[in-house]
Design a protein with these regions (language model features):
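Core SAM-dependent methyltransferase catalytic element
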Residues: 191-210
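Conserved beta-strand signature within the Rossmann-like core of class I S-adenosyl-L-methionine
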Residues: 142-149
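Conserved S-adenosyl-L-methionine
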Residues: 181-192
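Acceptor-substrate binding/catalytic loop of class I
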Residues: 155-171
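Conserved class I S-adenosyl-L-methionine
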Residues: 2-49
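A short acidic, Gly/Pro-enriched loop at the edge of an enzyme's catalytic core
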Residues: 102-114
Length: 210
């Protein structure tokens, strides 16, 4: 089923309103989440000379911006939630852009790496090819995209007050390859648990060149 422009605007507005209303609780609830495995997965595949220019896509309150900055890199944050943008700026001292995922305005070939941790699943399936293309264009040639999302059976819709699209590996792989990325690795999280207890699908991709 195709989503019309008004429906897409409503999806963004209502999902972002949820995060706006719960920003403080979200910050406290995720403050101590260990995503070091994900950060390492992005950084080890970047072949540029450090410090790396990084985009934290869906940076939330700025936890991972702080980590990238502490590692000596040059991160920029992006989020569609005004409260998160302000929190991230204050917490990290980094540049943070307020942008809706469905209305991006990204510089071309700016970043060595893009870190999309728990963010791209909010993009409706029909819009993903366009959004992935915009992320690809924002990477330098050979740049790296990391993505981690709740996995599923390719259904999408409302999960309480948030909209989400939940892909399995094969479908996600097809989407990324069609958008001009080549696979580097993928894994399930949290590490060390049986697959049925690993709700997160993480993957790393390089911008493919013609």
């Amino acid at each position: 089923m195709s989503l019309d422009d008004q429906t897409l605007r409503d999806i963004s507005r209502l999902t972002l309103q949820h995060y706006q209303d719960s920003a403080e609780a979200f910050r406290e609830g995720t403050r101590n989440h260990d995503v070091s495995q994900n950060i390492a997965a992005l950084l080890r595949h970047i072949h540029s000379e450090p410090p790396f220019a990084l985009l934290d896509f869906g940076c939330g309150p700025g936890r991972d911006l702080n980590t990238f900055k502490a590692l000596g890199h040059a991160p920029v944050g992006l989020d569609g939630c005004p409260n998160f943008v302000e929190m991230a700026r204050q917490a990290s001292g980094c540049e943070v852009w307020l942008q809706d995922f469905l209305a991006l305005d990204l510089p071309a070939a700016r970043f060595d790496g893009i870190y999309a941790n728990a963010s791209l699943f909010h993009v409706p399936r029909q819009e993903l090819p366009r959004v992935l293309g915009e992320l690809r264009a924002a990477l330098k040639p050979g740049g790296v995209l990391f993505a981690s999302n709740p996995r599923g059976d390719n259904a999408e819709g409302w999960n309480g007050p948030r909209y989400g699209a939940y892909h399995d590996w094969e479908h996600w792989k097809q989407l990324l390859e069609a958008a001009g990325f080549e696979q580097l690795e993928h894994y399930y999280r949290p590490a060390g648990l049986p697959r049925e207890q690993q709700p997160w699908l993480a993957s790393v991709w390089r911008r493919a060149e013609p």
